[in-house]
Amino acid sequence: MNQSSLLAEFGDPITRVENALQALREGRGVLLLDDEDRENEGDIIYAVESLTTAQMALMIRECSGIVCLCLTEAQADRLALPPMVVNNNSANQTAFTVSIEAKHGVTTGVSAQDRVTTIKTAANPQAKPEDLARPGHVFPLRARAGGVLARRGHTEGTVDLMQMAGLQPAGVLCELTNPDGSMAKTPEIIEFGKLHNMPVLTIEDMVQYRIQFDLKLA
C-alpha cells in the first residue's frame, strides 16, 4: 500500500494539514512524511515557541539523535550561521549550517534541557550571533524561500507549517526510528502517531493545501 491509502483513515489531504496545524497551535507534535521516491521518512516536528524539555527528551529517545532547528534564511543570516560545508554535495541538498550551542544557560549542551535552551536562544527574533557558541549539539537548517513549493523537504515543511499555523517561523525536527535503529516507514509512523496523539501528514498534502488556498509564505 502507498502513502495515500495508508493515510486515508486520517482524512483527505486538506483535513490532514488542518489537523496538523491545530495540533501545533495546541503545543503538540506532528509527523511529516516526505515523498516515497525521496527519503521516504517521517520526522517528528514541534514548534519552537511551545517546545518543552519532555518533548525534546522524546525526540532524543525515539529518533535518530540528530535534532535539527529549522530556521528562515533571514533568521539564519541574523545569527551569521554559515553553511556547514562550502560545497554541499549531499543527495538532497540539506542546508545544514554550523552546529550551535547557547553561550548561557547550558552545561555540556547535550541534555534535553540544554538543547531546548539553545534552540529557544537561536530562534529568538532578537538573537545575535554572539549569543551562540559554535560548534554545538544543535544542528540548524536553512529553509529555502518559497517553502515546499520550492523544495519538497522536511526543513521547508517545518517552517511552512509554523507560518500556516500562525506561529513563530521556527521548528525542530528529528527522523523517527524503529527500536532496532532502522528508519521508521509509513506503517510504523502511523502507529507512533496514534500512540502519541500526533497527526500524520505528507509534504504532498502541504503542496496541495498551499496551491488550493493560494498560500504565499515567506
From Swiss-Prot:
One Gene Ontology molecular-function label: 3,4-dihydroxy-2-butanone-4-phosphate synthase activity
UniProt pathway: Cofactor biosynthesis; riboflavin biosynthesis; 2-hydroxy-3-oxobutyl phosphate from D-ribulose 5-phosphate: step 1/1
Annotated site residues (Essential for catalytic activity) in this chain: 137, 175
Cellular component, GO annotation: cytosol
Cofactor: Mg(2+); Mn(2+)
Alphabetical UniProt keywords: Lyase, Magnesium, Manganese, Metal-binding, Riboflavin biosynthesis
Cofactor stoichiometry and binding remark: Binds 2 divalent metal cations per subunit. Magnesium or manganese.
Residues the entry annotates as binding D-ribulose 5-phosphate: 38-39, 43, 151-155, 175
InterPro entries to which the protein is assigned, alphabetical: DHBP_synth_RibB-like_a/b_dom, DHBP_synthase_RibB
E.C. designation(s): 4.1.99.12
One BP annotation, GO: riboflavin biosynthetic process
Keyword Membrane on entry: no
Catalytic activity: D-ribulose 5-phosphate = (2S)-2-hydroxy-3-oxobutyl phosphate + formate + H(+)
UniProt binding sites for Mg(2+) 2: 39, 154
Binding site for Mg(2+) 1: 39
Database matches in Pfam families: DHBP_synthase (PF00926)
Superkingdom of source: Bacteria
Function: Catalyzes the conversion of D-ribulose 5-phosphate to formate and 3,4-dihydroxy-2-butanone 4-phosphate.
Subunit text: Homodimer.
Family stated for the protein in its record: Belongs to the DHBP synthase family.
Record protein name field: 3,4-dihydroxy-2-butanone 4-phosphate synthase
Native organism taxonomy: Bacteria, Pseudomonadati, Pseudomonadota, Gammaproteobacteria, Vibrionales
